[in-house]
Amino acid sequence: MRKGGIQDAEPVEPPQSSRKSGTWFAKRPSEMPERHVERAPVRQKINNVGLYKATLYSNIGSFFFGIAVGWSGTAERSVMEQHSYSFQPTELQWSGVCILLTLGAALWCLPMGLMVRLLGCRRTILIQLLPNFLGWFLTVFARSVPMLYAGRFFLGMCGGAHCVVVPIYNAEISTTKKRGAMGVVFEGACICGVIYSFAMSLFLELRIINFVNLGLLALGPLQILMPESPAYYVDHGNIPRAEDSLRFLRGQKYDTRREIDFLTRDPTESEREVRQGPLLGFKYKKVRRSLARSLAIALLQKLCGALIFIFYGLNMLDCLRIRREFGLILCLGLILGFLACFFLVDRLGRRPLLIFSSAGIVFVSIYLGLHFKVWMTMGLTVMSWIALFCIAIFVGCYTAGVGSLTWVLNAELLVRPMRPLGCSIVCAFNWLTAFFVICWFGSHGVKCQPYLFLLFAIIASLILLFSLIYIPETKKLSSAKIQQRLGGLINRPAVITFTSSSDSSNA
């Protein structure tokens, strides 16, 4: 309930001693807590202004990464025609410029899990300012193709790090009622960066745009204002700092005792084992199951095709014989898709959005495939506009579903002790898939081929089926309840033999 901008907090779930409670690791008889009388949870008011600020600060780097991704599509003509640099790359070298962004992201994702465990999300995000500055500095002052390669690789490194750290951070600082909306802001920040790159390319020369992008990095130090995750402070025994962080996120009048008690409860022997070495967590079936589902949805996200429109969207407009200025219609589709996801993810839930958006991609892709087949044989120019609006619907459905929710589910399906390592593996796999997709697309002239869209329809159908069968609904659920729902087919709850990890998002 809201009153005067204040929201009632969902009470923190106290540790349960019943065998029927949602659990993660098997509790042995010696680990069972003593029975005691539980008092009814007391609801208290939460001021979410601090949460919104922390989410905004943490996604500044995501916006920078969106600019770097959008630069790939908007700069091609200027670079290839030698208007912005003293050198002129070949088509193969330009494909390398696009590919190295994804390769840098894939390689830099892997050490992020260790950095998050040791340094925390806040310091890991701040460290990325260095590769971000190096990347744009080399891009702006490139004197050769290898310098441009290096700049794009550094920018990819920074983006890959944010793909790992920001979703983890947003999941740990958010309440269960706000976790979905705060999680999709990451994709929204990237989209804003892409749209910014496209809009700037319509009015300014690439050389000026590069200097403006370099100047935008002055916003990076604002990330110092974001608090560290309370869970990180608790794990390192700094309870006063954890309480300060919670007051920043929930309001100065917020009573932190219940949430701190939940985070500081005694771990089971198996939980202590995983905290000593995350690799030990993979011997548990539900951890492997969560990771497998996250990997599958990450693979399908990059195969679905929207990345092609971002990297080669302007080329597709040329293929349709439409002026590049009308690419703003595609930007409108991205914005509407993100807004739909942002406002509905915590109301409808994750699964309905995945299912409906994937179904929309299937139908639009089939139509586009047939449309391009008819258009190429009949040569009707007016049909190009129909294709443009259909592509806008395609990217809108993608953003409303698998494009945004992949990052949310990546953090939600994994229990907190396994998130740093698990998310780094999933994100590395995600961007490695993007690397191969761009390699394949760049070497084949299939920008307006009907069979390309029919392939996208098949992949979207797989996303639809996978969401129906294997993805549980995680809306407003604690980590323990999410693990409980990770059953077999149709996500039937399995026998409850696992105990929940500490999860600060249960507040």
Swiss-Prot record:
Protein's UniProt keywords contain Transmembrane helix: yes
Chain ranges on the Cytoplasmic side, renumbered to this chain: 1-53, 117-124, 174-183, 229-293, 346-351, 396-420, 472-507
Transmembrane segments: 54-74, 96-116, 125-145, 153-173, 184-204, 208-228, 294-314, 325-345, 352-372, 375-395, 421-441, 451-471
Gene Ontology molecular function: any one: D-glucose transmembrane transporter activity
Annotated GO CC locations: cell projection; membrane; perikaryon; plasma membrane
Topological type in the membrane: Multi-pass membrane protein
Span of the signal peptide: none
Domain notes: Transport is mediated via a series of conformation changes, switching between a conformation where the substrate-binding cavity is accessible from the outside, and a another conformation where it is accessible from the cytoplasm.
Protein known as: Glucose transporter type 3
Gene: Glut3
